[in-house]
Each structure stands twice: as C-alpha cells, then as structure tokens.
Amino acid sequence: MALLNSNCPDLKLVARGKVRDLYEVDEKSLLFVATDRISAFDVIMKNSIPGKGKILTEISLFWFDLLKDVLPNHLITANFDEMPEKVQKYREQLEGRSILVKKMRVVPIEAIVRGYITGSGWSEYKKKGTICDIPLPNGLVESEKLPEVLFTPSTKAEIGDHDENIHPSKMVEILGDKKLADQIAQSAIALYTKASEYAASKGIIIADTKFEFGLDEDNNLVLVDEVLTPDSSRFWPANKYEAGRTQDSFDKQFLRNYLESINFDKNTSIELPQDVIENTLSKYKEAFQLLTGREVNL
C-alpha cells in the first residue's frame, strides 16, 4: 500500500519534508517516516512510488551500520517492536518505513560530495570551469572521474525553495565556526570514500551524494537524515560506465530525464505516468539488491 502522507494524530507533526514526515515522540526523540512521495527539481510530484519509502529506510539503515565507525549517527531503533506504545498504534501505516532517532540541532547545510562531474556540477563547469566556484582542470568531459573528491556544500532551502550551491568558504560564514565547517567537510569526504569503495565492490559507482549533519548535546557531529539512498545520491552501474556521456543509473535520474523530455515546468507539480513510476521503482529495487545482497520485501 502506497503512503503519500502519514496520518498520526496522537503524535506531534513537526514537519513534512519533500519525502519524510517528522514527528516528535518525546523531548529527546523524533520519528522519521519515509513516505512514498518523490520529488525532482525541488518539486514534489502529485502521485507516489509505492514502497519507495521502505526501500529508502532499509538502504539508510544499511549505510548507518556500515559507516558507524566513521561517524556516529542519530538512530535509536528501526525495530517497530522497540518503538514507544504511542507509535506502535500506527504499525500498519508506519512499519518498515520509520526510524526512531535522537533529537539533534541540525546543521543548516547540505553536505554534497562529488567523485564524478555530472548534474549541476557539469552545468557549472561548462560555463565557468568550476564547481561551486572551485576551479577545475580544463578538458574534463561529462561523467569523468574528478581528479580528487570534491566537497561542494549547498544551502538548506525551505520547502518550495531551491538549494543554492555555495563555495566552502561561504559555509564558514553561514556557520560562523571554521572548526565545525572543516569537520563537516572532512567527515563528508571520509563517509563518501568508505561508501564508494564498498559500492565499487558491488558494481556500483557513487558519482555524488548528499549528507546531513546534526550536533548532539555535547556539540559532537552526528550523521542524520537519510544516507546514500537513490534519492540523495547518483548510483551508476560500473559495467556500463563510459566518460563523455550521461550515464545509466539506479536513482532519480530516470525521473529527471523524463521530466526534462516533456519540458517540465519546474514550478508545477504533475501526475507521473504508470510506466515512469514502475521504472523508477525498479531502479530503486536494483540499487538495494546490489548494495545489500538482499531481496526487497515490500
């Protein structure tokens, strides 16, 4: 059963994001619910991808476990039997797509890491020879592996607004804390490096990804939100990779390409056709199976 919007009247709804609904459980914990909503170009589509939220949740849990030695994360439990009673009453709606997490002070930055030149980075490079105003060598081609992994942050926009790519020095201004900014950049690159090495062993190139961070009560940096999912990353099949062109992918790129092909108005939500829904879901399933070695159980 698809879930477009969760409905938990006995829990305090804190926010509805592009994909996740966020509830306060008590003064120290939150419930993250991954719905089946899908967005592209910062626009939420009118219909959903059934089961997508469960796949995203399972992939995030997989990465939280794999990367926990690089940086702690905000997870308390994803086992529904361990959730508080007031959450368990919504089992039918929420099980398999919810995680109970510690409350954190969220850092207002999208921590984007790029190993390959594609997407908005490729667009900027063609115009200016830079990504986030960071100069790059001449002569790079689309989808080429970058000379070194780049940390290219963006602002964290409100729903309906667009994230803005910024130079890392601008992040220092926004945070007002150079030490924290440096730690975020170093942690994001370390997380990406470990994840991309693992994914490569499974035949997947992680071209780029987006991390989000929070601070705990002792000001320790913590990994939060979703991690290395097909919503937040570009996953390419390694056996089909060829620099100089757009790549096949196991992620939202299929949807982005469809929307571009119909000259999508990036200010207006639309209803997606069934074949686009099915193709998008199959790509998410394939990413899950390749990364985890498990079958999807929707």
Regions found by a protein language model. Name each.
Residues 69-74, 194-206, 219, 292-298:
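Surface-exposed helix-capping loop/turn segments at secondary-structure junctions
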Residues 1-157, 266-271, 275-298:
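Active-site loop/lid in soluble adenylation, ligation, and acyl-transfer enzymes
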Residues 127-131, 136-180, 223, 227-291:
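Anionic ligand-binding catalytic core segments
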Residues 41, 122-123, 218, 232-234:
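Intrinsically disordered, low-complexity acidic/polar segments
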Residues 175-207:
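A long amphipathic alpha-helix within ATP-dependent nucleotide-binding catalytic cores
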Residues 113, 206-227:
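Conserved metal-phosphate-binding beta-hairpin within the catalytic cores
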Residues 29, 106-108, 203-206, 218-221:
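Coil-to-beta-strand transition motifs
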